[in-house]
Design a protein with these regions (language model features):
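Generic detection of well-ordered alpha-helical segments
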Residues: 8, 75-79
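Key DNA-contact positions within bacterial/archaeal DNA-binding proteins
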Residues: 38
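Basic, amphipathic "hinge/linker" alpha-helix immediately C-terminal to the N-terminal HTH DNA-binding motif
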Residues: 58-76
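Alpha-helical residues within the helix-turn-helix
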Residues: 31, 48-49
Length: 79
Protein backbone atom coordinates (compact mmCIF):
# COMPACT_ATOMS: atom_id res chain seq x y z
CA UNK A 1 0.00 0.00 0.00
CA UNK A 2 1.34 3.43 -0.94
CA UNK A 3 0.88 6.41 1.33
CA UNK A 4 -0.26 9.83 0.28
CA UNK A 5 1.47 12.89 1.72
CA UNK A 6 -1.05 13.15 4.56
CA UNK A 7 -0.44 9.52 5.54
CA UNK A 8 3.27 10.20 5.55
CA UNK A 9 2.67 13.16 7.86
CA UNK A 10 0.77 10.95 10.29
CA UNK A 11 3.39 8.18 10.45
CA UNK A 12 6.12 10.78 10.89
CA UNK A 13 4.14 12.42 13.71
CA UNK A 14 3.73 9.05 15.43
CA UNK A 15 7.47 8.44 15.17
CA UNK A 16 8.34 11.88 16.56
CA UNK A 17 5.85 11.64 19.42
CA UNK A 18 6.94 8.12 20.29
CA UNK A 19 10.59 9.17 20.43
CA UNK A 20 9.70 12.17 22.58
CA UNK A 21 7.16 10.66 25.00
CA UNK A 22 7.43 6.87 24.65
CA UNK A 23 3.75 6.43 23.84
CA UNK A 24 1.25 7.87 21.37
CA UNK A 25 -2.53 8.18 21.39
CA UNK A 26 -4.81 9.73 18.79
CA UNK A 27 -5.31 12.86 20.88
CA UNK A 28 -1.53 13.39 20.97
CA UNK A 29 -1.41 13.32 17.18
CA UNK A 30 -4.35 15.72 16.92
CA UNK A 31 -2.61 18.23 19.18
CA UNK A 32 0.78 17.80 17.51
CA UNK A 33 -0.58 18.20 13.98
CA UNK A 34 -3.30 20.70 14.93
CA UNK A 35 -6.05 18.63 13.32
CA UNK A 36 -9.37 17.33 14.62
CA UNK A 37 -9.68 14.02 16.44
CA UNK A 38 -12.07 12.69 13.76
CA UNK A 39 -9.42 13.42 11.12
CA UNK A 40 -6.89 11.43 13.13
CA UNK A 41 -9.38 8.58 13.57
CA UNK A 42 -9.94 8.42 9.82
CA UNK A 43 -6.20 8.40 9.11
CA UNK A 44 -5.55 5.76 11.77
CA UNK A 45 -8.18 3.48 10.27
CA UNK A 46 -6.43 3.70 6.91
CA UNK A 47 -2.94 3.29 8.40
CA UNK A 48 -3.98 0.16 10.32
CA UNK A 49 -3.63 -1.62 6.98
CA UNK A 50 0.08 -2.25 7.35
CA UNK A 51 1.58 0.82 8.98
CA UNK A 52 0.41 0.83 12.59
CA UNK A 53 -1.32 -1.17 15.28
CA UNK A 54 -3.45 -0.17 18.25
CA UNK A 55 -3.34 -1.92 21.61
CA UNK A 56 -6.20 -2.49 24.06
CA UNK A 57 -5.44 0.85 25.76
CA UNK A 58 -5.66 2.71 22.43
CA UNK A 59 -1.94 3.40 22.18
CA UNK A 60 -0.59 3.52 18.64
CA UNK A 61 2.53 1.68 17.48
CA UNK A 62 4.20 1.72 14.10
CA UNK A 63 4.68 -1.66 12.46
CA UNK A 64 8.10 -2.48 11.01
CA UNK A 65 6.85 -1.23 7.63
CA UNK A 66 5.49 1.92 9.29
CA UNK A 67 8.82 2.56 11.02
CA UNK A 68 10.74 2.26 7.76
CA UNK A 69 8.44 4.75 6.03
CA UNK A 70 8.40 7.14 9.01
CA UNK A 71 12.20 7.14 9.31
CA UNK A 72 12.57 7.91 5.59
CA UNK A 73 10.11 10.81 5.82
CA UNK A 74 11.73 12.10 9.01
CA UNK A 75 15.20 12.06 7.47
CA UNK A 76 13.93 13.71 4.28
CA UNK A 77 12.37 16.54 6.28
CA UNK A 78 15.53 17.04 8.34
CA UNK A 79 17.61 17.83 5.24
Amino acid sequence: MNLYASGEDYVEAILVLYKKFGSVRSVDIARHMEVSKPSVCHAVNILKEGFLTIDENHFLYLTSQGKVVAEKIYERHRL
